[in-house]
């Protein structure tokens, strides 16, 4: 309001002076220069107030609304009990909890956990991103940290609450190790102010503040931020396992009409490596596909199509040439043959429908969730990755760039084998291993597996030719139909129609 009054008074004054015959040009030039200086000097940024994002719906989110993170939820609830029952904690001489750090990959529900924590303690909730605090002008970040804590206290008092929760996403942006940003002390000043504010949190305050940070790079954080008395709890929020994925799918499909044939357990098995955000997107995409098809329920085909879309992206509008499609079909059948030899029944779908950056792909039914890999498992994975290019070479006497992503992944796995002591170099130190020795070890591993795959597929050239011809005609082959064709059974199965 004061801004509008000032502008009105200035305009009225200028009109009055103009009527009195005063030359206004010098005043206009001076005003323009002052405005330009104000914007370029950073004064505008310094004077601009900072406001965190207040979430009125935070109190509506509970831990029961979050699936797939049972261990993380249990650890957070245990920590929050010190705040809920602060009097009992004080009697035992327990230091008040000031900060909780949630560490884990993107999309695993760290923000939801923070909101549920606020609801659990009956606290006001305010959120900010680490990138909002750092500017090119010195002092801005520290000023915004002070404003954030002040806003949290005022918000709690406004709603007659004794607790406030501040959530800082991507906290590694402002909490990175000091001294790494040469020539830019703004980062260090911002972090110092955050440390000061957290040290100033007292159990005797009218409003008790809990700071919850989220990051996927704990290794980048300054040690001072992680010491006891600041972030007292570091809780890992990992990708959900199969049971966790099933819980998340049940939550996100609770408001959607599912066809009786939809098996959520099967979908959970096929989505190894999916985060909670991926699974929410999967359920939403399946509903969109059902809507487009005019269906009243979500069918298995909608979920199959949605899995492909989440993993690989939208279908491409541009259609490859017939020559390219033949090569893609041979490439994918090469993958499929080796996959079926390694683990019979592993192929779910093979298709030459372009999607995302892939001209075709083979989707497997994942094994049980595993977090350790043996040498044999890694070698078999290398064989599967190499098989597409070898199939192309056997039928077309040349390779294509379509295998480049396979080779990148194969090289990564071969390096993993070297660093795990699975090469002829034995146990090595990854940091001191010369690059030329690493390159030779990786090359030997890949050459050995390539020779094994070539020997295997040379005896299956006719199978590749026959099955790829069927794939060209149908564009998609379900795993059961593929296995019939490999076995030489040409009796057609009932087609599996994917949305």
Task: Give names to the regions the model predicted.
Residues 313-328, 370:
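Short pre-active-site segment immediately N-terminal to the catalytic Zn-binding motif
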Residues 99, 165, 323-328, 336:
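Active-site alpha-helix of zinc metalloproteases
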Residues 204, 223-224, 237-302, 316-319, ...:
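Conserved C-terminal "switch" segment of AAA+ ATPases
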Residues 32-44, 298-311:
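Short, structured interface segments
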Residues 55-268, 385, 400:
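Walker A/P-loop NTP-binding motif of AAA+ ATPase domains
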Residues 327-329, 336-499:
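Soluble catalytic regions of large protease machineries
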Residues 85-92, 203-208, 315-321, 344-350, ...:
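Active-site phosphate-binding and catalytic loops of NTP-dependent enzymes
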Residues 1-50, 409-412:
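N-terminal accessory segments that target, anchor, or regulate ATP-driven/P-loop NTPase machines
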